[in-house]
Amino acid sequence: MSFLWGSTKSKKGKNKKAAGSLPSGVVPQQRVKPTRKNVPIDYPRTLEKVHGESLIFRTSLLSELVSTGKSGIGPPDLIHCTELDKFHDEKIGEFFYITGIDASSVSMPIAFLKLIKWNDGKKLKSASLKNDDITTYCTFNIFQKLDIRLRYESEDVYQVNIVDCLNGNNEIPLSDLIWEETFVSCCIRSVIINSDFERKIPGLVELPFVFENRCASDYKRVIDSLCKFLPRFLECGWDSTKSVYATILNNYLTESLLVFLSITPEFITDYAIQVLDNLMTNDPSNSRYYAIVIISIMERSNDRDVEMIKRIHEILDLLLPVLYGLPSDEPYISDLINCITDVLSIQARFLLNNNDYELSLSISTLATNLSSDNFESWYLLSKGYIFSQQYDKALLSINSMPCLAEYDIVKQAQINAFKFYMNYYKAPLCHSREHCTMTSHELNHLMNIMHYENELELKTIIFGRTVMPNESKYGCIEEIWNKSCLELGPICGPQSDNLINFVSQQEVNTVGDMLLLKRSKETRQESWFIKQVRLLLMELVARIGWNALLQLRSDVFVMESKFKMIESSDKLSTELRQKRLCQRWFDAMFLDVYEDLSISTSSQENKATAKYSGLEWELLGLTLLRVSDLPDAVACLRTSILARFDPISCHHLLNFYLTMDFNDEFMRRFDVDIILDLLVKLISFRIRFYDRFQIFSLQVLRKLEGQLGSEIIKNKIINSPYGQAGITSVIDYMLECLSKNRNEACLAYERPLPDLPSTIKPLAD
């Protein structure tokens, strides 16, 4: 089942009729008499201040989010455990958040909750005996705004409850549709949360979902469900920092499908296209959605250009005549325009990548004329003008872009609500403060149930009221786990674009360059929109220089401050009439870029004598990255990692490798041994804090495997200084997930872990 938990011996018992509501066809599970001895604890636990408060918080949170239309993809799933402290005769509540549980039926969560009790060494009692150990699993259905709650006492006693988050009604009957919607909801949450560090909370457990058994039938089940639900993409929400509105390509459902395909074997991509082709035939009313998603899949696969171009022409030939034949007040027209502009953007991007700038400009111009508030169309138009050396028009195009939201209000509502959770977590800040806030009574309770004999040893893994054990050492590199992990804690949440919020204040105060510190604090949580526009500006700087860009700006624009100085009675000069008013956000960007360039220039002057801390090297590297000084940025980020393993610097370095083409000149400077070293260390750091999914790491490993081959990667790791059993088994597992030869057979696990009890069924059959 799940490698998150260890194993134990089991005694076979007689099958008994379940008192719960298992669906027909599910075989009653046999009894297990577990023993806690030698069973590793590999999940976190947060001790509640008041028993049951995490469940109360979830209820109020979902009610508020749903009533205000901000539920989005919903919060992570919740596991709540009730235990009895017999010495003080009181109930103690523990909980943690989790993604990746297969909630396609009740049997999967039941098996999971059973393992939690087994992992804690608790006796699974029969229905005739009093059971004070109650475990509850909660998961949110995005589509019907329902919270499915499974209350589990034993294999004989459990109850499934469905709560309408809008009105509190809990008498809703279970149905196959609800389970299917919940499964898709879990798919979306697993992918989106794993890809977005702002959404994560300390102690979040991220299981590898259907990847664990590396079974083609499991992969296909995800594809079938996600593709089937594509017409319901509007119900899933979208990231408003990347698009003004949801489209068939700008939504969390389609994003989840595309990301999922990026970490599965190639034959799964073929299967997805086949499924979508069948849906086009069987569901003609939504065929345009399926056709556009197929085109997007082909764009990402890199070896289907001819077929993609053919399909682009087919869909445009179908949709454009329909658009031109509709009256302007037709309600259907906005969706049709969105579909067409999505396709045109793919076409324009393809032409840009193939150096056909003239045709790309004509396509992008058509797209912006159809939809003036589509960011992607304006971005590609600006890029086309830059590449064709029409720099004045590029500036005008950038100025015409819709200024996207700094933050997504739906996501932010959930993040703000989870600040409640942060009362349970206290970052170590490089051991600069006491980060265990539990009472002696609570520590004694933990020592008893976790079988710790040394209180000081236990306190090293307690962060506030959250305990973070990882006893199996799966993915362990000792130097990472015993140093950076304990000093920094999990790197997640808002303002996690650099380490300022994760190191001691004393280390922050050692940063000598005040401008560097100021800009680093301002960019701890920078919007996606600003990052994209800066890329265009830095491309202009690389081509014509900063001073020439400033001169071009003054030729094209009049600044708002100067415009306000003009009296209304004054006649505008011919020169001013020919200029555009520079948008305020665009004007501010020039000031930010100027400050970053000043830092870059200063660093070049002080390069020979610079003596920086690890934090300063990171902040300088990220600043140089913002101004596209890639060679020096890479050098600074690597130096930061040498001073102290820095997962943020590591992520950026690996992202260079991931996003660059193999033929790129800068790409040739990357040593694959260095890339592999960084990747393995990042995997180890993140798996220490329960990220067993690691989409980004799988994407990097997939590219690395295409360059080296899996056997060379395995041999390099075995012969490396970190070739410890804990990490080598993780890499082997990830390579198996990506293997091109995994057609239909499910592969047995090869990791050196004890056998699971015979009564525990796999999560994915």
UniProtKB/Swiss-Prot annotation:
Keywords, alphabetical: Golgi apparatus, Membrane, Protein transport, Transport
Bilayer topology annotation: Peripheral membrane protein
Region (Disordered): 1-31
GO annotation, cellular component aspect: exomer complex; membrane; mitochondrion; trans-Golgi network transport vesicle
Region (CHS5-binding): 735-765
One GO term of the biological process aspect: protein transport
Coiled coil: none
Annotated localization: Golgi apparatus, trans-Golgi network membrane
Protein's UniProt keywords contain Membrane: yes
Major localisation: Golgi
UniProt miscellaneous comment: Present with 2540 molecules/cell in log phase SD medium.
Entry similarity comment: Belongs to the CHAPS family.
Reported function: Member of the CHS5-ARF1P-binding proteins (CHAPS) which mediates export of specific cargo proteins, including chitin synthase CHS3.
Subunit relationships: Component of the CHS5/6 complex composed of the 4 CHAPS proteins BCH1, BCH2, BUD7, and CHS6 as well as at least CHS5 and GTP-bound ARF1. The complex interacts with the cargo protein CHS3.
Protein name from the UniProt record: Protein BCH2
Organism ancestry: Eukaryota, Fungi, Dikarya, Ascomycota, Saccharomycotina
